Amino acid sequence: MLGRIALPSIFIVLSYGFWASSSFKDLAAGVALFLFGMLCMEQGFKVFSGGTIQRVLSASTDKLWKSLSFGVVSTTLMQSSSLVSVITISFLSAEMIGLAQGIGIIFGANLGTTTGAWIVAGFGLKVNISAYAMPLLVFGVLFLMQSSARFKGLGWILVGIGFLFLGIYFMKNGFSAYAQYIDLTQYAIPGIKGLLVFTLIGIVATVVMQSSHATLTLTITALAAGQLTYENALALAIGANVGTTITAILGSISANISGKRLAAAHLIFNMVTGAVALVMIKPLLHCVEFISGAVGIAADDYTLKLAVFHTLFNVIGVVLMVPFINTMVSWLESHLKGASVEYDQPRYLSEASLELPEVAQQAVYKETLHLFDNAFSLIAHGVDLRRSLVRGDQDLQELLEAPAQPIKIDLDDQYTRMVKDIYSANIEFISRAQAAAPSEFAERFAALRRANMDIVAAIKATKHLRKNLHVYSRGIDKNMRREYNRFRVRVGSVLREIGALREQDDRVVALLSLDRIKVETLDADNHASRIVDKLIRQGEISSQMATSLINDGAYTRELVGRLLDVARDLIQASTPHGEALGDEMSLQIEDIANIARSLDGAALPGEMEDYQ
């Protein structure tokens, strides 16, 4: 409702401004070019983010000072603390960093955003910046026309900087032209009232433009043109700092509880920093005068003094809040808790994660592991095995002769509660992420899609297998009980082996171990088929029992095969970007069948097709 009212209102105001004043055209065009330049730079930096994010994060955020530095450097490069905040929320939602690390990055981003004020005040207003914009645009477009993704990324960055420079130029001209017709300082509000009113204006302007950097640039150019008093400009800078948290809050709406906690930490930091700046405005002004004099800033150079003030109160905010990061983490974790839901929901997927392909891939990889953990319980219970038994070290062969202990479970109900929503969300997320990602991510997203589909197929095979297994594994016929217990042992063994593979850091070893499991599984299939043939020939089971064993043997092969495919796909999806997926290390299906044949004698007709 608010959006439907706000957009037409903005169009009406802008249209009237364009009709009433040519200077307003320059000013509005400057803001538009500046914001568009920021969008172009964001697009360019996203291209360079792929493939190195997790390695950079692990090396750059393992200590608090590194997290702060990461925030400072990334915001200085991107010139957008809002973008850094949203990306950090996506990192946290995907569990690529912890909450304390995320808070450190946010604090650093607030320091990094002060560099924008220095660039505009110290460079943008003192040289003919439009002269630099044109070559940047020309070279940027030239790079954009290349086929290489890296060149395109560089092109977006150069074009973005060019539009930023043009935006500053038009804003400066717009305010200079206004000075000939109207003195905006007549609307200045002195004292505490002025501080509060212009702080609010700064918040609103930042929310509307979704950029504190744009608000500060507008403030500095107005101050340089004499259209804004120094005191009111300080209040606008404070408001811009507080207003930038709105973008982080919006970015956290689709995030999990960790992302929401980080957005809350961002809000707390900026609110505290803004409150301290307002309360201590007089002492801060004295500090600004002292620092300005010490570094040689002229007494009437209010634009550079504004940059000093902006840096000073952000530094004070960081100094005040850093000692309380752990306290803040504890408070946020105790007061912001995930909702208790009847149906399990995705934990790691968020809209913010879609901004960067590698973050999106990591998020859906973790969500697929979450789905598999839920499916693990359903499958184990579906074949009457306790999770603790499967994950333990007891010899599962001991289960062959004893009647199964029934586990009461409604697979349809548990599927709806624990699997369905996560599976649907994963498939949708993969489709959206793959559509926006470069081609080099396609194989890994495809592997994750296959893993999700195989998990669901394994659960469905379990449901079919359970119908007879639930009867025969505890029945009086010892032959049928033993063979159905053999199905249970085979499923439990594969679940246990896959659990061990997840602890294996060496991907090559994991792939070779997976081939070993496949060989053992096919060998067990061959052996089971021979036993069924023997039981039929000797008349120890009825034809109806034999049919059940044959059909349920097929379901067991389907179930085990799907689980092994899931394991393989997850190994491929976890392969670091830029490395080979390791297909050359794996045995082909014919090789596996030949090895199994050598272990168990001549293969039965059709066994290889069954395995496939």
Predicted regions and their residues:
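Cytosolic, long alpha-helical scaffolding segments
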Residues: 97, 123-127, 254, 258, ...
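Membrane-embedded alpha-helical segments and adjacent helix-loop junctions characteristic
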Residues: 25-88, 148-219
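Juxtamembrane helix-loop transition segments at the membrane interface in multi-pass membrane proteins
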Residues: 44-57, 91-100, 178-184, 218-224, ...
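Alpha-helical transmembrane segments of multi-pass membrane proteins, especially transporters
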Residues: 31-34, 51, 55, 59, ...
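Transmembrane alpha-helices
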Residues: 1-33, 132-139, 368
